Amino acid sequence: MIEAVALARELLRIPSVSRDERAICDFIEERLQGDGELSLARFENNLVARIPGSGPRVLLAGHLDTVPGEDRVFEDGEVLGGLGAVDMKAGVAAMCEVATRDLARDLTLVWYSCEEIDASENGLRRLAGAMPGLLNVDLAVVLEPSGGAVELGCQGTLRAKVELRGRRAHSARPWMGRNAISRAASLVDRVDRLEPRRPILGGVEFKESLSAVRIESFVANNVIPDSARIWCNYRFAPDLSPEEAAARLLDWLQPVLEEGDTVTVEDAVAGAPATMSGFEGLVAAAGSVRAKLGWTDAGFLATHGVPAVNFGPGDPLLAHSPGEVVAKAEIAGCVEALASWLAS
């Protein structure tokens, strides 16, 4: 049987930045091939394992890739550290141990590539297209880091570009123009003052947020600019559709918009509904439950009618940071909680 903590230590030594997951996928495939209970299938740098069983069919999903960063592995007493320790090699290792446990449930496990980059390259989506029936499951758990709590659903996310108009002039005579950067400051202030909704959905509280994440404006060092572009990211609760979220964003920004300004939604995806139905045993084993603040592939699974939660080892606040560390006890605890639920 695979031991998750030892495997996580080995996985941390295998670089797997997005689009470079072949080596880690090969490694996991080789480790799992010796288990006679598993039926393995490989597509590109994505791996699927099937374990037949009874009861509801369950999918466990975890991505193999990491963001770029310093490739340094370290161990300090009861923690493991390194690029991807939290997001999400600890979860990937936990999946591997669960795959070799004696369980009662009908189980599908998916290790997939390119989650950290554009959705068009996401390995879970590519697998769903290449393997019809893969998502014909009753329940799913995405092993994103959750600090050992079960996180229900996920937020939707929307990215919009706002272009504000001004009037160009010489910077020695700024009163002859209208500075689009000054207008942008007013818009950013409006963005920062959005009162976040906090709806209770599925018994847990979601907190929305709106942030300015990028700004551009420049003509020359002696010119008052006549346009400014601000990109906003709206994280909305899963009771809103992307269309409803876009309408709410536009309504909020309207007081600082003028004729000629434009708001363009460049990307928007729905969240996943918060539901505990079917996951009660996992929540009991984990000991805590809350809302998922952020978007995960639980949202993608929801578009295919699959109820999904997030549950994995590691503090999500450390994801993508130089100090990613995960407690060994948390990895083991994740395995035991999943195994307890899946064996029931």
Predicted regions and their residues:
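Active-site metal-coordination/substrate-binding segment of hydrolases
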Residues: 57-111, 119, 123
